[in-house]
UniProtKB/Swiss-Prot annotation:
Its cofactor is Zn(2+). One of its GO terms (biological process) is proteolysis. Ca(2+) 2 binds at residues 218, 221, 223, 225, 228, 231. Monomer. Glycans are attached at residue 112. Expressed by the venom gland. This is Hemorrhagic metalloproteinase-disintegrin-like kaouthiagin. PANTHER family: ADAM A DISINTEGRIN AND METALLOPROTEASE DOMAIN, DISINTEGRIN AND METALLOPROTEINASE DOMAIN-CONTAINING PROTEIN 28. Belongs to the venom metalloproteinase (M12B) family. P-III subfamily. P-IIIa sub-subfamily. Disulfide bonds join 125-203, 164-187, 166-171, 219-248, 230-243, 232-238, 257-277, 264-296, 289-301, 308-358, 323-366, 336-346, 353-389, 383-394. Residues 14-208 form the Peptidase M12B domain.
């Protein structure tokens, strides 16, 4: 089992500031059409983001470089050689110029063998946080699946065994895929969590600024981008009560975002300045509740009747006042409060703030709920008009709180 601190780290949203290089061969393959290449890359990033969302990872495209004149290092068909060259180029040239968490080379070269991608395993936030993908198919979704697969390796995820399943398939980390993959398997999620706790990559905890993101703003992708105030995903998925998922704008001030749950709770309203609903707040202590049967106390409406029902069941109610008068005796069972180990009897006005007495409906008994020390009236319980129990005394509700 994990420590609370480990669980906090696992649950935290992760952000990969992602840099993509399109090499010269891919540029030529798309007939020197930079706008078309950009759209293709933006669509891929969007697809990759969708696949990583269940892992609480957001991919933020903070740089897209198209090598329209020539490659900045020699891109070779040997995948491992190109990966090493790309790693060295990122380290010496790209990082000093533009900080990033991970970089990808998207190449038009035909990599040797059956490989269409290669990555350093478990390498995020290190000098080896790079991968190479061949743009091997016109179908964007297939290449986006390969991007997700190789970035998965960077995140410590191994290839799936035969026993690993995901619905719908095929799984993203299968070694060989012929169709676009949509989901990580349970094995992949386990690998990823083990990698996170082992290596603790820190660079993925900071959220990129909206001005750093170079891809066009898409309302519904969980990123607050230029022109958006909030982004909580699709209208069906949105969990932010004060963000309008359809427009990615804050809901107006005064819109109710959390209804009052009961008499002693207050409704919360959006501020117009935040996507989140304000903290749950309670009705003030002493506010009348349950048709004036009680007064609010710390978000509850304590009454003697409810206390009897909670302890003994729905067939019980509070005893008549005659039973409570026994609290003036100050003996073993009937008293108002303890002082230095001594049971203090109740004054006549305080009897309903001492030992609790309940009666089975349609009987006249004075029952004491079973407890060796007796059950006392709860603090804040109404003991008369405008009066509540406080420290074993029946006091004015105006001065009690």
């Amino acid at each position: 089992t994990n420590t609370p601190e480990q669980d906090r780290y696992l649950q935290a949203e992760k952000y990969i500031e992602f840099y993509v290089i399109v090499d010269n061969r891919m540029y030529r393959y798309y007939n020197y059409d930079k706008p078309a290449i950009k759209i293709r890359v933006y669509e891929m990033i969007n697809a990759v983001n969708t696949k990583f969302r269940p892992l609480k990872i957001h991919i933020a495209l903070i740089g897209l470089e198209i090598w329209s004149n020539e490659d900045k290092f020699e891109v070779k068909p040997a995948a491992s050689v190109t990966l090493k060259s790309f790693r060295e180029w990122r380290q010496t040239v790209l990082l000093p110029r533009k900080r990033n968490d991970n970089a990808q080379l998207l190449t038009g070269i035909n990599l040797n063998g059956t490989a269409v991608g290669i990555a350093y395993p478990g390498s995020l936030c290190t000098q080896r946080s790079v991968f190479v993908v061949q743009d091997y198919n016109r179908r964007m979704s297939l290449v986006a699946s390969t991007m997700t697969h190789e970035l998965g390796h960077n995140l410590g995820i191994h290839h799936d065994e035969a026993s690993c399943i995901c619905i719908p398939g095929p799984c993203i980390m299968l070694k060989k895929r012929t169709a676009p993959a949509f989901q990580f398997s349970s094995c992949s999620i386990r690998d990823y969590q083990e990698y996170l706790l082992r290596d603790r990559p820190q660079c993925i905890l900071n959220k990129p600024l909206s001005t750093d993101i170079v891809s066009p703003a898409i309302c519904g992708n969980y990123f607050v981008e230029e022109g958006e105030e909030c982004d909580c995903g699709s209208p069906a998925a949105c969990q932010s009560a004060c963000c309008d998922a359809a427009t990615c704008k804050f809901n107006g001030a005064g819109a109710e975002c959390r209804a009052a749950k009961h008499d002693c709770d207050l409704p919360e309203l959006c501020t117009g300045q935040s996507a989140e609903c304000p903290t749950d707040s309670l009705q003030r202590n002493g506010h009348p509740c349950q048709n004036n049967q009680g007064y609010c106390y710390n978000g509850k409406c304590p009454t003697l009747t409810n206390q009897c029902i909670a302890l003994l069941g729905p067939h019980f109610t509070v005893s008549p006042k005659g039973c409570f008068d026994l609290n003036m005796r100050g003996d073993d069972g009937s008293f108002c409060r303890m002082e230095d180990g001594t049971k203090i009897p109740c004054a006549a006005k305080d009897v309903k703030c001492g030992r609790l007495y309940c009666t089975e409906k349609n009987t006249m008994s004075c029952l004491i709920p079973p407890n060796p020390d007796g059950i006392m009236a709860e603090p804040g319980t109404k003991c008369g008009d405008g009066m509540v129990c406080s420290k074993g005394q029946c006091v004015d509700v105006q001065t009690a709180y």
